[in-house]
């Protein structure tokens, strides 16, 4: 069963394969490789990029898309997530894409349902497709991860993007630096070194900004002065390496974690990340719907 719930599930070879497939899709002609398949998108947290990127990817592949949220399912009536997914499986869904506020919600599903679960973000846990599209964007720029320095700035403790990226980038040979307010450092994340903001920016090939995750804080953070203290200001951007790039998983809070003039500057790859997200999610969907042994379906072969 080709679930994708965390980056740690993927070997380096599998990551390379997904990146290669996404590149082939981007450079080639889109085919309706999954025509006739049904996918259910269950988003229990707000989402623009991930939700609609998945939906575009699914429709480009010819899939039938069922889009659901917490107001349109029986979860509102007390039904468990497992029973919801099992219901969708029973009526013919071939895969489920799920975003949920609970960390590791998928542990109650994998091994119990007979369709692939694709994690579109779990609480403060993991965001594997975001990590893959970030890898694709970095690879397009530098061709390799080996020897790169990637700094991740901001609300590290509450960021599933930071958690997914730090692990996989370290595994692929990059050095990861963390920077941000001390209270938002993640003591459990062993895949990066905490340094001062200016030092991190000057040392980096990739400067990755994160928004403040107010929805995961007990009290709303004070954003006054945050940009000058911890964000990417225009002055700090001048100290970046000549070839360095700026990334952000979005949504972007302009003027908070990044100066508004930098969002679409020459070094920015923020909207390129969003574009690459469609191709990565197409590759992930194709991987998920290769031979489903329990259903006895034919394999979908990657295109390259």
From Swiss-Prot:
The keyword Chloroplast does not apply. Coiled coil: none annotated. Keywords: Pyrimidine biosynthesis, Transferase. GO terms for cellular component: cytosol. This is Aspartate carbamoyltransferase catalytic subunit. It comes from Bacillus velezensis (strain DSM 23117 / BGSC 10A6 / LMG 26770 / FZB42). It catalyses: carbamoyl phosphate + L-aspartate = N-carbamoyl-L-aspartate + phosphate + H(+). Catalyzes the condensation of carbamoyl phosphate and aspartate to form carbamoyl aspartate and inorganic phosphate, the committed step in the de novo pyrimidine nucleotide biosynthesis pathway. The keyword Transferase applies. GO terms for biological process: 'de novo' pyrimidine nucleobase biosynthetic process; 'de novo' UMP biosynthetic process; amino acid metabolic process. Carbamoyl phosphate binds at residues 49-50, 99, 127, 130, 250-251. Belongs to the aspartate/ornithine carbamoyltransferase superfamily. ATCase family. The lineage of its organism: Bacteria, Bacillati, Bacillota, Bacilli, Bacillales. Heterododecamer (2C3:3R2) of six catalytic PyrB chains organized as two trimers (C3), and six regulatory PyrI chains organized as three dimers (R2). HAMAP family: Asp_carb_tr. Gene3D superfamilies: Aspartate/ornithine carbamoyltransferase. L-aspartate binds at residues 77, 160, 211.
């Amino acid at each position: 069963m080709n679930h994708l719930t965390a980056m740690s599930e993927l070997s380096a070879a599998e990551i390379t394969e997904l990146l290669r497939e996404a590149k082939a899709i981007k450079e080639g002609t889109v085919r309706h490789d999954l025509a006739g398949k049904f996918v259910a998108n269950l988003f229990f947290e707000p989402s623009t990029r991930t939700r609609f990127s998945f939906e575009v990817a699914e429709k480009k592949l010819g899939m039938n898309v069922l889009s659901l949220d917490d107001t349109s399912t029986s979860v509102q009536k007390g039904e468990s997530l497992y029973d919801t997914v099992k219901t969708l499986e029973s009526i013919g869904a071939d895969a489920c894409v799920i975003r949920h506020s609970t960390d590791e919600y998928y542990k109650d599903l994998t091994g119990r349902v007979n369709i692939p679960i694709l994690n579109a973000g779990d609480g403060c846990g993991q965001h594997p497709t975001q990590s893959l599209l970030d890898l694709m964007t970095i690879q397009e720029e530098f061709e390799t991860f080996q020897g790169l320095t990637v700094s991740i700035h901001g609300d590290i403790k509450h960021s599933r993007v930071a958690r997914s990226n730090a692990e996989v980038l370290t595994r692929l040979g990059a050095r990861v630096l963390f920077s941000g307010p001390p209270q938002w450092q993640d003591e459990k994340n062993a895949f990066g070194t905490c340094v001062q903001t200016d030092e991190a920016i000057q040392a980096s090939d990739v400067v990755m900004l994160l928004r403040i995750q107010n929805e995961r804080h007990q009290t709303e953070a004070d954003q006054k002065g945050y940009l000058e203290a911890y964000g990417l200001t225009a002055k700090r951007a001048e100290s970046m390496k000549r070839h360095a790039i700026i990334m952000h998983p979005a949504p972007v809070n302009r003027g908070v974690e990044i100066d508004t003039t930098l969002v679409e500057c020459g070094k920015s790859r923020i909207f390129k990340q969003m574009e690459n997200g469609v191709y990565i999610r197409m590759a992930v969907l194709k991987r998920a719907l290769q031979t489903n042994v329990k259903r006895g379906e034919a394999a979908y072969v990657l295109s390259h």
